[in-house]
Regions:
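A short, N-terminal "cap"/entry segment at the start of jelly-roll beta-barrel domains
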Residues: 1-37, 45, 121-130
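A short hydrophobic beta-strand segment most commonly corresponding to one strand
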Residues: 35, 89-90, 95, 101-119
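Conserved short histidine dyad/triad with adjacent acidic residue
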Residues: 35-57
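Short, conserved beta-strand element in jelly-roll/cupin
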Residues: 38, 54-72
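Short beta-strand segments in beta-sandwich/barrel cores
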Residues: 43-44, 68-73, 96
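Short acidic-glycine-tyrosine-enriched beta hairpin
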Residues: 74-94
Length: 130
Protein backbone atom coordinates (compact mmCIF):
# COMPACT_ATOMS: atom_id res chain seq x y z
CA UNK A 1 0.00 0.00 0.00
CA UNK A 2 1.34 3.42 -0.94
CA UNK A 3 0.92 5.94 1.83
CA UNK A 4 2.84 8.83 3.29
CA UNK A 5 4.89 8.07 6.35
CA UNK A 6 6.66 10.24 8.87
CA UNK A 7 9.12 9.61 11.66
CA UNK A 8 11.34 11.91 13.67
CA UNK A 9 14.92 11.55 14.82
CA UNK A 10 13.67 13.16 18.05
CA UNK A 11 12.02 9.77 18.76
CA UNK A 12 14.34 7.41 16.88
CA UNK A 13 13.75 3.73 16.22
CA UNK A 14 17.19 3.16 17.72
CA UNK A 15 19.92 5.18 19.42
CA UNK A 16 23.52 3.96 19.35
CA UNK A 17 25.97 5.59 21.70
CA UNK A 18 29.74 5.29 21.55
CA UNK A 19 32.69 7.20 22.96
CA UNK A 20 32.07 10.93 22.37
CA UNK A 21 29.12 10.40 20.03
CA UNK A 22 25.71 9.02 19.24
CA UNK A 23 23.61 8.12 16.22
CA UNK A 24 19.81 8.37 16.17
CA UNK A 25 18.29 6.06 13.54
CA UNK A 26 14.94 5.91 11.79
CA UNK A 27 13.96 3.61 8.94
CA UNK A 28 11.44 4.42 6.22
CA UNK A 29 10.88 2.70 2.90
CA UNK A 30 13.86 0.40 3.37
CA UNK A 31 16.27 3.30 4.00
CA UNK A 32 18.01 3.80 7.34
CA UNK A 33 18.45 7.49 8.04
CA UNK A 34 20.85 8.55 10.80
CA UNK A 35 21.54 11.77 12.65
CA UNK A 36 25.02 11.66 14.15
CA UNK A 37 26.19 13.96 16.91
CA UNK A 38 29.96 13.87 17.42
CA UNK A 39 31.58 15.79 20.27
CA UNK A 40 34.86 17.72 20.11
CA UNK A 41 37.68 15.20 20.44
CA UNK A 42 35.75 12.46 18.61
CA UNK A 43 37.88 10.46 16.18
CA UNK A 44 36.74 7.30 14.41
CA UNK A 45 40.03 5.47 15.01
CA UNK A 46 39.83 5.96 18.78
CA UNK A 47 36.06 6.06 19.43
CA UNK A 48 34.51 3.59 16.95
CA UNK A 49 37.40 1.40 15.75
CA UNK A 50 37.32 -0.64 19.00
CA UNK A 51 33.73 -1.63 18.11
CA UNK A 52 34.28 -2.16 14.37
CA UNK A 53 37.62 -3.97 14.75
CA UNK A 54 38.74 -2.83 11.28
CA UNK A 55 41.83 -0.82 10.28
CA UNK A 56 39.67 2.04 9.02
CA UNK A 57 35.95 2.75 8.63
CA UNK A 58 34.61 0.34 6.02
CA UNK A 59 31.22 2.07 5.67
CA UNK A 60 30.32 4.31 2.72
CA UNK A 61 28.66 7.53 3.88
CA UNK A 62 26.42 9.99 2.04
CA UNK A 63 26.03 12.89 4.46
CA UNK A 64 24.57 16.36 4.84
CA UNK A 65 26.46 18.43 7.41
CA UNK A 66 24.36 20.64 9.68
CA UNK A 67 26.96 22.01 12.09
CA UNK A 68 30.57 21.71 13.17
CA UNK A 69 33.55 20.64 11.06
CA UNK A 70 34.61 17.10 10.20
CA UNK A 71 37.86 16.09 8.52
CA UNK A 72 38.29 12.73 6.79
CA UNK A 73 41.42 11.04 5.49
CA UNK A 74 41.29 8.08 3.11
CA UNK A 75 43.60 5.08 3.45
CA UNK A 76 45.49 6.46 0.41
CA UNK A 77 46.24 9.71 2.32
CA UNK A 78 43.81 12.04 0.52
CA UNK A 79 41.97 14.41 2.89
CA UNK A 80 38.89 16.62 2.85
CA UNK A 81 37.16 18.83 5.43
CA UNK A 82 33.38 19.23 5.62
CA UNK A 83 31.23 21.87 7.30
CA UNK A 84 27.69 23.26 7.51
CA UNK A 85 25.80 22.97 4.22
CA UNK A 86 28.22 20.45 2.69
CA UNK A 87 27.02 17.22 1.14
CA UNK A 88 29.73 14.57 1.39
CA UNK A 89 30.34 11.16 -0.13
CA UNK A 90 32.99 9.35 1.91
CA UNK A 91 33.84 5.87 0.55
CA UNK A 92 34.96 2.92 2.69
CA UNK A 93 38.56 3.05 3.91
CA UNK A 94 38.78 6.26 5.93
CA UNK A 95 39.32 7.80 9.34
CA UNK A 96 37.52 10.98 10.41
CA UNK A 97 37.57 13.41 13.34
CA UNK A 98 35.89 16.52 14.69
CA UNK A 99 37.84 19.72 13.97
CA UNK A 100 37.65 22.49 16.57
CA UNK A 101 35.51 22.96 19.65
CA UNK A 102 32.00 22.62 18.20
CA UNK A 103 30.07 19.35 17.97
CA UNK A 104 29.44 17.95 14.50
CA UNK A 105 25.82 17.20 13.65
CA UNK A 106 25.18 15.48 10.33
CA UNK A 107 22.54 13.47 8.54
CA UNK A 108 23.70 10.24 6.86
CA UNK A 109 21.41 8.47 4.42
CA UNK A 110 23.55 5.55 3.31
CA UNK A 111 26.00 4.45 5.95
CA UNK A 112 24.20 4.05 9.25
CA UNK A 113 22.39 0.70 9.24
CA UNK A 114 25.40 -1.11 10.77
CA UNK A 115 27.46 1.85 12.01
CA UNK A 116 29.06 1.68 15.48
CA UNK A 117 28.00 -1.90 16.15
CA UNK A 118 30.30 -4.59 17.49
CA UNK A 119 32.09 -6.58 14.79
CA UNK A 120 30.16 -9.69 15.86
CA UNK A 121 26.87 -8.08 14.72
CA UNK A 122 25.55 -9.79 11.57
CA UNK A 123 26.14 -7.97 8.31
CA UNK A 124 23.25 -6.53 6.36
CA UNK A 125 20.72 -3.81 6.95
CA UNK A 126 19.13 -3.30 10.33
CA UNK A 127 15.53 -4.48 10.61
CA UNK A 128 12.86 -2.17 11.95
CA UNK A 129 9.13 -2.41 12.37
CA UNK A 130 6.89 0.49 11.40
Amino acid sequence: MNKMQKKTVLQPDERRTFDQGQVDLVSLGGVTFGRATLQPGWKWSTCVKPLAKTKSCQVSHLQYHLSGRLRAVMDDGSEQEFGPGDVALIPPGHDAWVVGNDPVVLIDISGMANYAQPASHPAGPAHFTD
